[in-house]
Amino acid sequence: MSFNDTQEQFAPNMALVPMVIEQTSRGERSYDIYSRLLKERIIFLTGQVEDHMANLIVAQMLFLEAENPEKDINLYINSPGGVITAGMSIYDTMQYIKADVSTICMGQACSMGAFLLSAGAKGKRICLPNSRVMIHQPLGGYQGQATDIQIHAQEILKVKSRMNELMAQHTGKSIEEIERDTERDRFLSANEALEYGLVDKVYTQRS
């Protein structure tokens, strides 16, 4: 997780998106694949976590809650992490809305991706068997006058403390354990993430 809020390195994914064509009573209707999956209450969190992507994720969750606040939302995660403030906007929305958010890790959930994976509804946090999870403390860098550097250092320590508290709540670990285990990059397999309390289940196929 990066504490810096510079976004230049995080460009929206411009890859071609497949289209899906459906037959309706009024003829054919085409959707991009992500819009079609959104109809099934599936949201994809892929790539770097940054403001543009986070705003889209938040908007989709709010839309699905407005459509049906009693039905689960499925958040598929394949992310190396990213900017803390962007990730926290997703986190707060997950906790704020009435609908349960089930989190599913496919590929990787590292840094902020792992934090969001752990923040899913209890009993509904899932890892696919060959996924990788990585947790660590926030990263930051700042240049400027000594006083400004001190201010930013104090702020990143506050953020680190708060994130350790939240991770402890979601995993059942103590704050001391979280602080120790995130001192350096810690990589976990799907089963290790299950044992650690980051997820509740490891699925090899749909039940």
UniProtKB/Swiss-Prot annotation:
Q: Which PROSITE patterns match?
A: CLP_PROTEASE_HIS, CLP_PROTEASE_SER
Reaction equations catalysed: Hydrolysis of proteins to small peptides in the presence of ATP and magnesium. alpha-casein is the usual test substrate. In the absence of ATP, only oligopeptides shorter than five residues are hydrolyzed (such as succinyl-Leu-Tyr-|-NHMec, and Leu-Tyr-Leu-|-Tyr-Trp, in which cleavage of the -Tyr-|-Leu- and -Tyr-|-Trp bonds also occurs)
For this protein, the parts annotated as crossing the membrane are none
Q: Which family does it belong to?
A: Belongs to the peptidase S14 family.
Gene Ontology annotations for the cellular component aspect, listed alphabetically:
cytoplasm; endopeptidase Clp complex
Set out the biological process GO terms recorded for this chain's protein.
protein quality control for misfolded or incompletely synthesized proteins
Cite a single Pfam family from the UniProt record.
CLP_protease
Q: Which UniProt keywords apply?
A: Cytoplasm, Hydrolase, Protease, Serine protease
Biological role: Cleaves peptides in various proteins in a process that requires ATP hydrolysis. Has a chymotrypsin-like activity. Plays a major role in the degradation of misfolded proteins.
Q: Name the Enzyme Commission number(s) assigned to this protein.
A: 3.4.21.92
What InterPro entries does this protein map onto? ClpP (IPR001907), ClpP/crotonase-like_dom_sf (IPR029045), ClpP/TepA (IPR023562), ClpP_His_AS (IPR033135), ClpP_Ser_AS (IPR018215)
Catalytic-site annotation from UniProt: 111 (nucleophile), 136
By what name is this protein known? Answer: ATP-dependent Clp protease proteolytic subunit
